[in-house]
């Protein structure tokens, strides 16, 4: 039979063996349907499309391939449109993240997947109740606060040395860290606590991981390749990650990503500014995790984004021409911004309420070129350090001066006061929950001044001044009143100072100290030497608040020490004062607990030593029995000379030692 004898059906079957049939994708999983768009004539179609592209392409990795407007006979839009993405994941993300988008006051855009219409059209008429899944409670990430050790006032801290990461309890009476969990290669670089202490962040080549709970389980994983920096929102609801990317795609940026902590969902991504303009944190968080903001790169104003939608506040930039810096209040929804002097206009500092953008206060300053914002942690005061040049008789006699503007933000009409410091400022810090300010200033680092000011009813008063100090950094106790003044990176001088009584508790030294960290209670403070900066004598010292060394730990290749933060202090100043007044009632209880704890630890240690002694004596007895059992063998061999039991004797030597001499005068007898 020749090939021409084969019929057509046989020929088709033969070809299919060599080439698979074409697979046609009949799904619409890359399409979404946007409803409630404005009804527009044909002349406005392109403008409407550009608006829709701007909205629905502003998601991480989203790329709009096409937009199809539904039209009527007069070529007017029908109020809905079809949008096609390059991949189905973008369509799913848009349906969940961009639903109910407020286009304007009259139009709220609704989004559905096009594939969902077939599901809704074939919906079963017979109701089937959903299956109930068993409730699985999530771990309590603040469980450690109810731990008996935490209730006794002990705090946790994390250390990194070599390849080890240790989480320890600070039980001071033990005299050493009590390790709760030790891990090897837990992170590739460093670790970081969240602001409330609920999570511990570890860094990896492909992203970061969050750990927490009683058993330190992995809470969530955030994929962001090359991530180097993390910034949590004040209440730990969101976090921002940064990874340096040389050529980031503006349509799908990957440098800066905002995440929802609990769900692990990526909310939005941003381009990073040029390297020479980059600062961290890249965004500033408002109080209550409500907004994030950063200055627009052309200095036209501030981009303020609402959470969790990550849309611009009022869909536009907050315009402030020439803005150089801004800062949120730590407790209120208000921000302060600075615009430098621009001849002939003076510089100005403004305090603005959000989201109304109402101006609360404004101060004009002639000749100011730079400003730094310093908020008191309760938001009651804002101190702005301004740098300006005061011109002398000639241009060569320009003398740099530093002035401060104090805003009383919680008082009616926000009163503003000014005060000046004679020399250049090295460090500035507010007392937590207090009214005192500490400033290090001077011309020479070997001869610095430390000035303490107090905000009073109508003025800012100098209350104390230290002279001829070799100090460069200020570390306030979290409870205020006490402050540690340090000279980091050099001699490691430490001065413990009480601002209430204006007295120094004393000075100490931790050579080549690279960092200081107070524990949340304010009872202890840690100084450490990190291997990242110094290669010898690395480790940490823990001091009491008045400068007594509690214990010292040296570790080879020691990198990091961080106390675990506690959640925000919930007690008011009135409640704190009541506790202070009744402290004697609690003192006996606490002393009894400490005594019982010490006895328990001593008992455990003594039991351990007794067990070791019993084990040693048992080993000796076993060896003696084996030795006696081999006596016939030794006699037969004649190689060893046994000890005659009669040669063993016990000698007791009595030693008299003079312990004490007392002179007693007896009554004279006549």
Swiss-Prot record:
SUPFAM superfamilies: RNA-binding domain, RBD, Tricorn protease domain 2. One of its GO terms (molecular function) is translation initiation factor binding. InterPro entries: EIF3B, eIF3B_RRM, Nucleotide-bd_a/b_plait_sf, RBD_domain_sf, RRM_dom, TIF_beta_prop-like, WD40/YVTN_repeat-like_dom_sf. Gene3D superfamilies: 3.30.70.330, YVTN repeat-like/Quinoprotein amine dehydrogenase (2.130.10.10). The keyword RNA-binding applies. Pfam families: eIF2A (PF08662), RRM_1 (PF00076). Residues 568-600 form a coiled coil. The keyword Flavoprotein does not apply. Keywords: Coiled coil, Cytoplasm, Initiation factor, Protein biosynthesis, Repeat, RNA-binding, WD repeat. RNA-binding component of the eukaryotic translation initiation factor 3 (eIF-3) complex, which is involved in protein synthesis of a specialized repertoire of mRNAs and, together with other initiation factors, stimulates binding of mRNA and methionyl-tRNAi to the 40S ribosome. The eIF-3 complex specifically targets and initiates translation of a subset of mRNAs involved in cell proliferation. Component of the eukaryotic translation initiation factor 3 (eIF-3) complex. Its main location: cytoplasm. One of its GO terms (cellular component) is eukaryotic 48S preinitiation complex. It is found in: Cytoplasm. The gene is eif3B. Residues 30-116 form the RRM domain. GO terms for biological process: formation of cytoplasmic translation initiation complex; regulation of translational initiation; translational initiation. WD repeats lie at residues 183-221, 222-269, 466-507, 509-553. This is Eukaryotic translation initiation factor 3 subunit B. It comes from Dictyostelium discoideum. The lineage of its organism: Eukaryota, Amoebozoa, Evosea, Eumycetozoa, Dictyostelia. Belongs to the eIF-3 subunit B family.
């Amino acid at each position: 039979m020749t090939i021409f004898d084969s019929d057509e059906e046989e020929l088709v079957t033969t070809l299919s063996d060599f080439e698979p049939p074409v697979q046609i994708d009949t799904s619409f999983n890359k399409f979404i349907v946007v409803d409630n768009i404005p009804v527009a004539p044909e002349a406005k179609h392109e403008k409407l499309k550009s608006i829709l592209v701007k909205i629905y392409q502003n998601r991480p990795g989203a790329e709009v391939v096409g937009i199809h407007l539904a039209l009527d006979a007069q070529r007017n839009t029908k109020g809905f449109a079809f949008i096609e993405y390059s991949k189905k994941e973008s369509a799913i993300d848009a349906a969940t993240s961009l639903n109910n988008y407020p286009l304007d006051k009259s139009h709220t855009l609704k989004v559905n997947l096009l594939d969902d219409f077939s599901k809704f059209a074939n919906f079963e008429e017979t109701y089937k109740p959903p299956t109930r899944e068993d409730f699985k409670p999530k771990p309590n990430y603040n469980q450690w606060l109810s731990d008996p050790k935490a209730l006794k006032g002990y705090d946790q801290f994390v250390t990194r040395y070599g390849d080890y990461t240790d989480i320890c309890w600070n039980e001071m009476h033990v005299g050493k860290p009590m390790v709760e969990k030790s891990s090897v290669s837990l992170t590739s670089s460093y670790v970081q606590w969240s602001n409330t202490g609920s999570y511990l962040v570890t860094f990896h080549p492909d992203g970061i991981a969050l750990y927490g709970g009683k058993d330190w389980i992995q809470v969530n994983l955030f994929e962001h390749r090359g991530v180097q920096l993390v910034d949590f929102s004040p209440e730990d609801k969101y976090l921002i990650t940064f990874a340096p990317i040389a050529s980031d795609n503006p349509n799908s940026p990957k440098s800066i990503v905002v995440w929802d902590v609990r769900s692990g969902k990526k909310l939005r991504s941003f381009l990073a500014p040029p390297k020479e303009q980059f600062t961290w944190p890249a965004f500033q968080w408002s109080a209550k995790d409500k907004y994030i903001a950063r200055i627009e790169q052309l200095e036209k104003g501030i981009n303020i984004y609402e959470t969790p939608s990550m849309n611009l506040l009022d869909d536009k930039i907050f315009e402030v021409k020439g803005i150089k810096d801004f800062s949120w209040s730590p407790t209120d929804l208000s921000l302060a911004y600075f615009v430098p002097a621009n001849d002939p206009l003076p510089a100005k500092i403004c305090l603005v309420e959000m989201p109304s953008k109402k101006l609360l206060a404004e101060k004009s300053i002639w000749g100011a070129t730079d400003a730094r914002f310093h908020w008191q942690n309760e938001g009651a005061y804002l101190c702005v350090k301004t740098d300006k040049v005061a011109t002398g008789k000639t241009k060569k006699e320009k003398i740099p001066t530093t002035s401060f503007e104090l805003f009383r933000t919680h008082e009616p009409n926000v009163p503003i006061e000014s005060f000046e410091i004679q020399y250049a400022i090295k460090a500035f810090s507010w007392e937590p929950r207090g009214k005192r300010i500490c400033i290090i200033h001077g011309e020479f680092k070997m001869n610095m001044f430390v000035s303490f000011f107090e905000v009073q009813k109508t003025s800012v008063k100098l209350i104390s001044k230290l002279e001829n100090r070799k100090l460069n950094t200020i570390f306030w106790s979290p409870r205020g009143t006490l402050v540690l003044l340090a000279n980091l990176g050099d001699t490691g001088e430490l001065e413990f100072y009480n601002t209430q009584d204006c007295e120094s508790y004393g000075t100490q030294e931790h050579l080549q100290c690279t960092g200081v960290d107070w524990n949340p209670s304010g009872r202890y403070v840690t100084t450490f030497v990190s291997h990242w900066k110094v290669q010898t004598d690395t480790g940490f010292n823990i001091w009491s608040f008045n400068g007594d060394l509690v214990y010292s730990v040296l570790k080879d290749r020691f990198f990091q020490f961080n106390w675990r933060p506690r959640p925000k202090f919930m007690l008011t100043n009135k409640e704190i004062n009541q506790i202070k007044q009744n402290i004697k009632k609690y003192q006996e209880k606490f002393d009894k607990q400490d005594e019982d704890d010490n006895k328990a630890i001593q008992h455990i240690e003594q039991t351990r030593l007794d067990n070791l002694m019993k084990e040693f004596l048992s080993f000796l007895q076993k060896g003696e029995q084996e030795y006696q059992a081999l006596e016939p063998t030794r006699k037969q061999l004649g190689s060893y000379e046994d000890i005659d039991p009669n040669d063993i004797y016990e000698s007791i030597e009595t030693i008299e030692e003079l312990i004490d001499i007392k002179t007693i005068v007896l009554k004279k007898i006549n």
